[in-house]
Amino acid sequence: MESIWQGGLPIRMSVLLSILLYSFGVVAAVAALALIRPIPRLGLRTRRRALVAWLLAIACGVGTLIWPTHETRVASPVSRLDHIVPIYQFSEVHETTIEASPERIYRGICTVTVNEIALLRTLTLIRRFGRPGPDSVLNPPGDKPFCEVALSSGFYLLADEPPSELVLGTFVAAPKAARANPPPQITAATFMAIHSPGFAIAVMNFRLRSIGSARTRLTTETRVFATDATIRRRFAAYWRVIYPGSSIIRMMWLRAIKRSAELPAVAD
């Protein structure tokens, strides 16, 4: 079963803040309706009460958006992800157990197509507000492997170590000068060297660990490192809005990998 309750307090805080943000949004929407027509059964008997409820909900919602972030430092690296992003402020971890060998699962990670990942196209459609655009992770063609789409639209392969770990990374934010003059080759070393203000990098991995005969624990973790306070504040608000959808996509991706790996097939 896929899980999001990995990685300790920072991840649980991300879940809590996102839940609170959307809850306050619902309260604000209901209070706004009560400003037009009071809703006595919800305690909003007058427009004055509705206005107070709306203002409180808006204030609390803003509070969740600007809540301070927690920085995590990896003390003892155990994965390629740990080496590439040893310091980060935002993360999410999901895992599943698959009845197949690591070799078989690893081969399938980047062959799972967009159409095989439930809700992916729906959530990316919502994220881009229904606007059309070129093929990308926000507008993925259904018949292509999602990894292929990512690597052709701003993501980079940072580590490919079968059958143990695959790492992809992208630039969430970068100064104009850096975007105009990118390095000729972007590797894990490029990401590890980023410390100048104005950057935010997102790196995700798929890590496999055998836990028995033809039984594997597959984990995916995403980390975001923002290099300065301004970028951290901006990304914190964005992260708390997109976190639920991001988590669903990763859980559905794991589920698609699991389903594909456990299908009857020629032995590895």
Task: Specify the residue positions occupied by each region the protein language model found.
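Membrane-embedded alpha-helical segments of integral membrane proteins
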Residues: 8-38
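Hydrophobic-ligand binding "helix-grip"
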Residues: 16-19, 45-54, 64-70, 151-214
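A conserved amphipathic terminal alpha-helix motif
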Residues: 30, 234-268
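Transmembrane alpha-helical segments that serve as helix-helix packing and pore/cofactor-lining elements
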Residues: 39-44
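Hydrophobic ligand-binding cavity/cleft-lining segments
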Residues: 55, 61-158
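Beta-strand/loop substructures that line and gate deep hydrophobic ligand-binding cavities in soluble
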Residues: 74, 187-245, 257
